[in-house]
Design a protein with these regions (language model features):
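N-terminal single-pass transmembrane signal-anchor helix
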Residues: 1-29
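Long, compositionally biased, intrinsically disordered regions
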Residues: 25-388
Length: 388
């Protein structure tokens, strides 16, 4: 009898414990399931949006190449190149329209409206397929460089990467007053390969007579297992903000950046060269064509300069290199080298559009390989639901 009563008491306690556990656990399980469903819905939406960005050409199909650019005339957003056989190949003109420093930019809010993403936020970024770190030093007659190629994911060195290097220098002689006191020279490319540490180094010895090197760049076209990227090494990083370079179709546009660097003086364009993965091709040389000289200043009517080169879009150069004559504080009159249209000096991240993700919101991350100007990049979409 006592044993039976004891058994009933134990059973009641066990049932009570199960009931309490169920009451506590079911909401947690339900909440977990709801969170999982919400995250899956977020990923599905991000996937659809990412494909729309990368696979759709938008409307009109050449919206990034139209000059003058009016974002209100863009009826549908998409970055794809207008070719049915070019899946995940992006139009560089459209990508450049995402640059906030571009004189013809499409704003983030406008893209949100075109994609009907009023309840969501996103950031679209482009990265190199691998990391590249470099150094470049000059003497009066010699340019020396070194570079290291590593995996972006974990920093593992990449041996046997092909590094094709094309040099260009500017040089001067005293008294640095006349145009003849400044010259620019480009050189045939040289090919190197990284060792077991992912590194390689080389040098260029010049013979410029009475001229001494002032500035130098090394355009490094790096190929790993069929994937390639271009990095531009230079001996003076601060000069990169002297001018803003954009291309749209066959047209090159130069403008002043928002944050001027070192000088507010005029920029005189002395030479323009285009890099096509093999060589530097001269497009413009001051005095050779009309107009004989080109300049941009902060004066009214001179803040922008554009010139068209028929066939430029077909050539699709990865780098445009400009020799600019400027007057720098503490240096005086000099001839510098500026590259564009993208940021080629960064080792990893090349471009980002949109605000940084908010840490309190669940974020879906999507990545795809894309091609821009015949170079492979990792595109990344960070996608989240905005707080109500």
């Amino acid at each position: 009898m006592v044993s039976a009563a004891y058994d009933h008491m134990v059973a009641i306690v066990i049932v009570g414990m199960i009931f309490v556990a169920t009451v506590v656990a079911l909401p947690a399980i339900s909440y977990s399931n709801m969170a999982t469903v919400d995250q899956q819905q977020l990923r599905n939406t991000a996937y659809s949006v990412f494909d729309a960005m990368l696979l759709d050409v938008g409307s009109p199909s050449n919206w990034g190449s139209n000059l003058p650019f009016d974002p209100n005339k863009v009826e549908k957003f998409g970055l794809a190149y207008a070719d049915p056989f070019s899946k995940f190949v992006l139009d560089s003109d459209k990508v450049q329209r995402l640059d906030p420093a571009n004189p013809g930019v499409i704003e983030y809010d406008r893209v949100v409206d075109l994609l009907n993403l009023e309840e969501y936020g996103f950031q679209l970024s482009f990265y190199r397929p691998f990391s590249v770190n470099w150094t470049l030093d000059i003497t009066n007659t010699v340019v020396r460089f070194s570079t290291t190629v590593t995996r972006s994911e974990d920093g593992t060195p990449i041996p046997n990467a092909e590094v094709r290097v094309t040099f260009m220098v500017t040089a001067s002689k005293l008294p640095k007053q006349d145009d003849g006191d400044f010259i620019s020279e480009k050189y045939d490319p040289k090919t190197y390969y990284t060792n077991v540490t992912g590194s390689c180094a080389g040098f260029l010895s010049t013979n410029l007579g009475e001229y001494n090197i002032d500035y130098a760049v090394a355009i490094m076209h790096i190929t790993v297992a069929g994937l390639s990227t271009t990095v531009l090494a230079q001996n003076a990083n601060p000069i990169t903000n002297l001018i803003k370079i954009n291309t749209f179709g066959d047209t090159i546009t130069l403008s002043f950046p928002d944050n001027l660097n070192d000088t507010n003086s005029e920029r005189r364009i002395k030479e323009i060269d285009a890099y096509d993965f093999k060589n530097l091709m001269r497009l413009f040389k001051a005095g050779d064509v009309n107009p004989p000289e080109v300049k941009i200043t902060k004066g009214s009517g001179y803040e922008y300069w554009s010139i068209s080169f028929p066939g430029l879009r077909a050539v699709n150069p990865s780098v445009l290199l400009f020799a600019l004559q400027v007057t720098l504080k503490g240096i005086g009159r000099t001839l510098v080298l500026i590259a564009g249209p993208f940021s080629f000096g960064d080792s990893e991240k090349v471009f980002a559009f949109g605000p940084d993700p908010q840490s309190e919101n669940p974020i879906a991350i999507m990545r795809r390989l894309v091609v821009i100007s015949d170079m492979t990049y990792i595109s990344q979409l960070a996608f989240w639901r905005e707080q109500a």
